[in-house]
Amino acid sequence: MTVRDVIQKIEPRMKKTIEAFQHELASIRTGKATTALLDRVKVEAYGSQMPLKQVGNVGVLDAHTLTVQVWDKSMVGATERAIRDAGLGLNPSADGQNIRISIPPLTEERRKEFVKLTKKFGEDSKVSLRNHRRDLIHEVEKLEKEKLISEDELKRGKKDADDLLHKYEKQITELIAQKEKEIMEV
């Protein structure tokens, strides 16, 4: 096993961290209607908590309105409650088997809360990236102890780990800035 093999093993985990962070960002309100906004909503259905996607179709009606077409009419009330109680500041209204959700404009205070949440998710993702870097360095040091690589290769491996970390941390920082701009846009 070489340093390159270790990097090829760890880098996909770093990419997954970025993807997970992007998914988290998609669920944060910006004032525009997106289906990802309701990704975290869980509905009490048939005795268990189910993701909203498994209870009905979520769609965008216009820039400020989402719709949920609930498949089982008996689930409309529970779905409406779940959306209201999700802590997103949304007030759904049922119309037969369809639920309309108007996305109200964000208050300045709410925008700042969402920016804080974005930064928290970003910091959590950076911690995860640092843990992957630590794992990479640990693997490379193990190879050096087993005399499978030289001391120079160990140093190069550590530098590569740092470079990889900086590359992905930079992506997270850029995503945070982009989301912050979206949130603060009135």
UniProtKB/Swiss-Prot annotation:
Pfam families listed in its UniProt record: RRF
GO cellular component: cytoplasm
SUPFAM superfamilies in the cross-refs: Ribosome recycling factor, RRF
Keywords tagged on the record: Cytoplasm, Protein biosynthesis
Major localization listed first in the record, in broad terms: cytoplasm
Alphabetized HAMAP family for the sequence: RRF
NCBIfam families for the chain: frr
Full protein name: Ribosome-recycling factor
Organism in which the protein naturally occurs: Chlorobaculum tepidum (strain ATCC 49652 / DSM 12025 / NBRC 103806 / TLS) (Chlorobium tepidum)
Source species taxonomy: Bacteria, Pseudomonadati, Chlorobiota, Chlorobiia, Chlorobiales
Encoding gene, per UniProt annotation: frr
